[in-house]
Amino acid sequence: MAQEEEKDAGISKYISTTDEIIIGCKCWVEKDGEQRLAEILSINNRRQPPKFYVHYEDFNKRLDEWILASRINIEREVTFPKPRDPDEKKKKKQKKSATPQATDGETLESADIMDLENLNVQGLRDEGISRDDEIKKLRTSGSMTQNPHEVSRVRNLSKIIMGKHEIEPWYFSPYPIELTDEDVVYIDDFSLQYFGSKKQYARYRQKCTLRHPPGNEIYRDDYVSFFEIDGRKQRTWCRNLCLLSKLFLDHKTLYYDVDPFLFYCMTQRDELGHHLVGYFSKEKESADGYNVACILTLPQYQRMGYGRLLIEFSYELSKKENKVGSPEKPLSDLGLLSYRAYWSDTLIKLLVENGTEITIDEISSMTSLTTTDILHTAKALNILRYYKGQHILYLNEDVLLRYEKLIAKKRRSIDPEKLIWKPPIFTASQLRFAW
């Protein structure tokens, strides 16, 4: 048993130089003044000095980074990956054919992930689907396609400059390989075109006349504007947007498959033009009733309330369509937190201000939230009770206190009167996306 554990853990030994380190090694790395255990995911020897791409154990993937050898502590043991057993692949194949129904979805990792679909509400069927199983059930095109390759674990751009903002990417994005050796990649604020040198970018900027997303402006107030862009009509711009967003979204998006989507881009105006703040995409025809496919606030604008405005705007569109909607699952960790906060505040505000008896279906009709999202939110707020075969909601002191704080905050919100938009109608030929 002890030998098995040692084999699974790998082989630990001391090394004399970092030249002995290979991909898959686990070693101690200096991070923020502390020694942290990290796994080597990639090694770049194309330039000197060599760099190592590391993932810190028990830390979010977005903190992965390229480091120099000087940060690796070779005075402590390095764990090398266990040697591959040539018969292991054969055994796995035999095991797989013997048990075709077995799945590897229910892992310890998936159990730790907060998933909306696993929230049990009394009286509702709890399917108990893990995040991995849920991903397998989703369609394999559009925004939900997973990148199974090992290369997707390695962030390929070190830094981007977008307008006046310098940003460190979080994840891999399939930009052209020639950009991956550049210390900085320049991304145009308006066209989202990318460049490997400042000179190229400056020359392009002199010629480019675009000053806003290439679509129809459907909303404007004194704070933000929204543009609607058809992925089929503006393929290059939308692909550039997806490449950019993939740097900050780990779980979905296929950059070249933009035809089936409409993109709703939120911008801020100044004397130079409309600067992209965030966006959400939406399927032209969603069989599952999703009103959002991907949603992102760019990192330089996060924690300023823009994400909430994006979510609120998506529901305003659903109200105009006379539909209920929900975001495509699984949500990212930050997306899930934002949606839960929006659903909670919307439900509390409606219940307190309505003051009369109201059904869950009526709440759904007024807010465009699905009944499932309403029930899950009510359960999380601890205001849901199952009484005589039906769900009832009641307001407790915590909810009333939260309502007072909500009103005191005076958040910016979307003004429905300023939304100039009719739900687009597409013919069968327009919904064919073979190209």
Swiss-Prot record:
InterPro entries cross-referenced by the UniProt entry: Acyl_CoA_acyltransferase, Chromo-like_dom_sf, HAT_MYST-type, MYST_HAT, Tudor-knot, WH-like_DNA-bd_sf, Zf-MYST
UniProt-annotated site: Important for catalytic activity, residues: 294
Gene3D superfamilies per record: 2.30.30.140, 3.40.630.30, N-acetyl transferase-like, Winged helix-like DNA-binding domain superfamily/Winged helix DNA-binding domain
Pfam families the record matches: MOZ_SAS, Tudor-knot, zf-MYST
Domain named MYST-type HAT: residues: 152-423
PROSITE patterns referenced in this protein's UniProt entry, alphabetically: MYST_HAT
Record keywords: Acetylation, Activator, Chromatin regulator, Chromosome, DNA damage, DNA repair, Nucleus, Transcription, Transcription regulation, Transferase
Tudor-knot domain ranges (all copies): 22-73
Catalytic reactions on record: L-lysyl-[histone] + acetyl-CoA = N(6)-acetyl-L-lysyl-[histone] + CoA + H(+); L-lysyl-[protein] + acetyl-CoA = N(6)-acetyl-L-lysyl-[protein] + CoA + H(+); 2-hydroxyisobutanoyl-CoA + L-lysyl-[protein] = N(6)-(2-hydroxyisobutanoyl)-L-lysyl-[protein] + CoA + H(+); (2E)-butenoyl-CoA + L-lysyl-[protein] = N(6)-(2E)-butenoyl-L-lysyl-[protein] + CoA + H(+)
Documented EC number(s): 2.3.1.48, 2.3.1.-
GO biological process, one term: DNA repair
Cellular compartments annotated: Nucleus; Chromosome
Primary localization class, coarse: nucleus
Record note on modification: Autoacetylation at Lys-252 is required for proper function.
CDD domains referenced in this protein's UniProt entry, alphabetically: CBD_ESA1_like, NAT_SF
C2HC MYST-type zinc-finger residues: 185-210
Positions of region (Disordered): 78-108
Positions of the catalytic residues: 328
Enzyme type, top EC level: transferase
Sequence motif: ESA1-RPD3 motif, positions: 235-256
Ranges of Basic and acidic residues composition bias in the record: 78-89
GO molecular function, one term: peptide 2-hydroxyisobutyryltransferase activity
Domain commentary: The ESA1-RPD3 motif is common to ESA1 and RPD3 and is required for ESA1 histone acetyl-transferase (HAT) activity and RPD3 histone deacetylase (HDAC) activity.
Family membership: Belongs to the MYST (SAS/MOZ) family.
Subunit structure: Component of the NuA4 histone acetyltransferase complex. Interacts with arp4.
Protein name (database record): Histone acetyltransferase ESA1
Organism field: Eremothecium gossypii (strain ATCC 10895 / CBS 109.51 / FGSC 9923 / NRRL Y-1056)
Gene that this polypeptide is encoded by: ESA1
